[in-house]
Amino acid sequence: MRKIFTAIIEYDPETKQYVGMVPDVPGVHTVGSSLEEVRRNLKEVLELVLEEAGDEINHQEFVALEMIEVET
């Protein structure tokens, strides 16, 4: 069965690395030197965690990403 998970990827200018995580699944986070690498790493880690956890993962159907504007 195929499932789609939401991943969040940010660029860290201090380390010059992309940092990725899947909020729905504890333990799924990784880094990569490019977007392609971090995507590949996230998929690999996610597959390993899901294989280990079996049906214990509570997959969320919706995750919101909001832009919040503030005065600075």
Swiss-Prot record:
It comes from the Bacteria. One of its GO terms (biological process) is regulation of DNA-templated transcription. InterPro entries: TA_system_antitoxin, TTHA0281-like, TTHA1013/TTHA0281-like. Pfam families: UPF0150. Belongs to the UPF0150 family. This is UPF0150 protein TM_1321. It comes from Thermotoga maritima (strain ATCC 43589 / DSM 3109 / JCM 10099 / NBRC 100826 / MSB8).
